[in-house]
Amino acid sequence: MPEIAQPTPMMRQYLETKARYPDALLFFRLGDFYELFFEDALTASEALQITLTARAKGDDKVPMCGVPHHAARGYVARLLEKGFKVAICDQVEEPGKSAIVKREVTRVVTPGMVFDDQVLDPREASYLGVVALAEGRAGLALLDASTGQLQCGEVPDDARAVDELRRAGVRELVLPLGADAARAERIERAVGVPAARRPAADYERADDRLRRHLGVASLDGFGVGGEPLGLAAAAAALAYLADTQRATPRHVDRVSRLRTEDVLLLDEATRTNLELERTLNGGRKKGSLLALLDRSVTAPGGRRLAEWLRYPLTELAPIHARLDAVEELAGASVAREDLAAALRPVADAERLLSRLVLGQGNARDLRALAGALLALPALAELLGGRAAALLRDAGEGTRGLEELAAHLDRAVAEEPPATLREGGIIRRGFSPELDEIVAVAEDGKGFIARLEAREKERTGIGSLKVRFNKVFGYYLEVTKANLHAVPSDYERRQTTVGGERFVTPELKRFEETVLTAEERRIAVEGRLFEELRQRVAEAAPRIRTAADAVATADALLALARVAAERGYCRPEVDGSEVLEIVDGRHPVVEAVLPEGPAGFVPNDVLVASRGALECERLGALHVITGPNMAGKSTVMRQAALVTLLAQMGAFVPARKARVGIVDRIFTRVGASDDLARGRSTFMVEMTETAAILHNATRRSLVVLDEIGRGTSTFDGVSIAWAVAEHLHDQVGCRTLFATHYHELQDLARERPAVRNLTVAVREVGDRVVFLRKLVQGGASRSYGIEVAKLAGLPAEVLARAREILKNLEALEVDEGGHAALARGRKTRRADPQSQLGLFAPAPAPADPALEEIASALRATEIDALRPLDALNLLAAWRAKLR
C-alpha cells in the first residue's frame, strides 16, 4: 500500500477502498471521471494507452490517469480482454450533503463476471469455472452469471477437470486457497485463463448454503445430491458472484448436474481438429461448423445451439426427440417462417433478467423484457399445435407471464432514457402521484401566469407581479401605491424601495411543489422502478423457464433451416456399433464449393466395431492411403462430423446415414507444436495418440491421420503399425487410419477386420487428376512430387526430386515395392554396400563397351558353346575393355 505523508480526506478514502481490493484495478469516481492512482494508474495507462499524469500534494506526486464515466464500459471491456479485474467505486450520495462524498464499490467486473451487453458476445456463454479439490478427485461448477445457469458435478481426475473446463470455454477460474498449491497451479496453467483464489469458507457447508439460497429442503430434486465436491464448487461460485456484484444472485434459482455421463466426450484436440467453433487457421468463427449451423433468430437460441454442439448426446430418447422436431420443421417451410417471425421480437430475457435482479439493469432493460414477454403468447400458440413433443413443450414453457408482460408494458415508457435522473421512464397514466408531479414540473410557467391573473382580478391591483429570486423564492410584488388593496391573507416577506413583497398559502404550496418537483419526480420514478424490478425478480423462475423454452425452439429451428436448405437427411441413430454413411459430405467444405461437377464429391464410410455382427462385412479399421491433397483428411473429418451431428440431434449431410451410438470421438489430424510448453510437433502428436490409446473404448470412433510422420521413416512406420495393431486387437473400435506408409496395407493380410481403402487418382499424361473418391484397395504412390509441382516448387528442384525418388524406388526389395512388415513373410534385402545415399550425386553414364558386352552376353546361348568358343569370347570382351 502506498504511503502519503498527509493524505487528503479523498485520498484517505481511496487508500482504504483500494486496501480491500488489492487484486483489482480500482475505478474511483471523481465527478465525471473514473480515476486510477499509484500502481493502478501505471498499469491502466499502459494497457489502455491513455495519458499518465500526476496529482501533486506538497512533496508527494501521485501517478494518476482517468477515463470519462460515460465511456467507462469500453475501457473496462479492454481491460477484461487483457485479463484484469476492475473494481467500480461509485459516488453513492449527491455532492454537497457531507464534507466528503460517500463512495462504495458497487461491483467488481472480472472476466467471468460480466453483465454488460456491450462487452458480452450475445451468442456465447460466459462461464466462470470453479474447482474444489480432494484426494484423487475434483469437483467442478460452471456458472454463467449473465444468465443464471449453474451446473456442478465431480470428475475422477485433474486431467478430466481441465478438459471439461476447456470444453465449456470458461473465461475465469476460481481455485481454493490453502489447497495443494502445486496441483492448483497445474490446473490453472492447463486451463489458461485468469484465476482467483478464494478462502476455504466459500466451499464449506455447501449443501446447507445451497438449500437456503434455492429455498428448498433437499437438493435431490435437482439431481445433484451425492457429489459433495461438486456442491462445494457450486457454493463457492455463488459466493464469488455475490461478493463481486454486491447483491444476492436471486436469478440463480436452480442448479443442474454437470453433464459428464450422458454426453459424447470430445477432448480438446478433437474439438480443435474438427473446427467445431473456431477454425484452425486464425481461430475465427467464420468457417467453423457452428457458424454454418447457427441459423437461429435469437441470441439465446445461438447459445443453446453451441451448447448442443459441445455436448452431443449418448441417450437415444432425447436424440430422437430432437430429430422428430427438426424433421417436422424441416418439412414445413411456412411453419419455419412463422416460427422465425414469432421469435424475432423476443429479446435476450435471460441476460436482461440477470442485470435487473442484480441491480445493474435500467429502464431500457425493463422495456426490452416487456417486449420479449409480450411476444410469448403468439409463440406459445404457434408451438402448441405442433406434433413434435419438444416443440409443444417449448410452447407450454412460454406461458404464464401474460400478466407481468401487461403490467410492465403499462408501466414503462416506450423509449425510456438510460438513467433515472433524466426522468421519463414511467408511462403517463400509470401512477396518479407521478402524473401530478410531472404536470406541475412541466406546467410551472402556466400556473404562475394563471395565478397572477387571478390575483390581479381579486385585488384589483393591475400592476401586481409574481416574481422569483433564489433568496425568497416565489413572491407577489405590490407597489406602494397599491398597498391599501392588499388582502388580509397576504403575508409580508420584504419591504423594498418601490413597494413590498408578499406570499400566500397557495404560492407557498406551489413553490414547494415546483422547486422539489424534479427531485420528487426522480424519487417517485426510482421507487416505481424498484417496485417493477422486484416484481421481475419474484417472477425470475418463470422468466428463466420461458427463456429456456425460447432457446430450445430457436435451436431446433436453426437445425431445421440448415437441413432443409442444404439437403441433409435424418440419420438412423441406434444402439449398434455401426457407422454407415452413404454419399456423405463435409458440411463446411461443401458449403464453400460451387454446385455441379466442380462441387463436393460425396463418399461412403462403412465401418463397425470388432465383435459387431456387421464387422465381417464392413471391417473395424480402415487403412486409407492415397495422394496428398486427394481428400483423405476431409473424408475422415466428415465421418466424425456426421457422427457428432447425428448425436446432437441434427440432420446430416449424406444421402443415408446409420450411426450406432459413440461414447467418444478422438481425432489426431494435422500437426502443430507447443513451444510454450516445450513440446515438439512429434511430442504433441504422440501425447494425443497416447490419450487415445488409453481412453478409447469399443464404442469410440477414432480418426488418425499420418501417425508417426514427425520422426524418421522406420520409427514412424513402426509406431504407426503398433498403434494400428493395438486399436484393432485391444480396443476394437471403429477406426479410420490415414497414412502415407504404404507398408500398413499389409495389416489386412493378417488382421481380419482391417480394410484397405484409397482415394482414387487418374494420370492424364504427366498430369495427375484427384478424383476425391474413396475406393477399395491400396495406393502404391503418394504423388508428392505432383503436389509439390502444383504448389509451385522450382522446376530444377522438382527434377532433382524425381531423380532421388528413382534412386529410392530402385532399392525397394519386395514384390509390393516396399518393405514387408507382416509376420511370416519372406523378404529380400538389398546389398547394403550397393545402396546409394539419399542425396548422393546422380550415377555416371554407363560405359558403351560394357553395354555392348552385356548385350552380347544376354544373346549368347551358353549351353551350346564349346570351351574354346567361350575362351575366345572372353578374350574379345577383355580386349574391348582395354
Swiss-Prot record:
GO cellular component entries: cytosol
Gene: mutS
Top-level taxon in the UniProt lineage: Bacteria
InterPro entries, A to Z: DNA_mismatch_repair_MutS (IPR005748), DNA_mismatch_repair_MutS-lik_N (IPR007695), DNA_mismatch_repair_MutS/MSH (IPR017261), DNA_mismatch_repair_MutS_C (IPR000432), DNA_mismatch_repair_MutS_clamp (IPR007861), DNA_mismatch_repair_MutS_core (IPR007696), DNA_mismatch_repair_MutS_N (IPR016151), DNA_mismatch_repair_MutS_sf (IPR036187)
CDD domains: ABC_MutS1 (cd03284)
Protein name, per record: DNA mismatch repair protein MutS
Keyword DNA repair: yes
Gene Ontology process terms (BP): mismatch repair
Role description: This protein is involved in the repair of mismatches in DNA. It is possible that it carries out the mismatch recognition step. This protein has a weak ATPase activity.
Family from the record: Belongs to the DNA mismatch repair MutS family.
Residues noted as binding ATP in the record, renumbered to the chain: G626, P627, N628, M629, A630, G631, K632, S633
Gene3D superfamilies recorded: 1.10.1420.10, DNA repair protein MutS, domain I, MutS, connector domain, P-loop containing nucleotide triphosphate hydrolases
NCBIfam families reported for this sequence: mutS1, PRK05399.1
Any GO MF annotation of the entry: ATP-dependent DNA damage sensor activity
Record keywords: ATP-binding, DNA damage, DNA repair, DNA-binding, Nucleotide-binding
Pfam families according to UniProt: MutS_I, MutS_II, MutS_III, MutS_IV, MutS_V
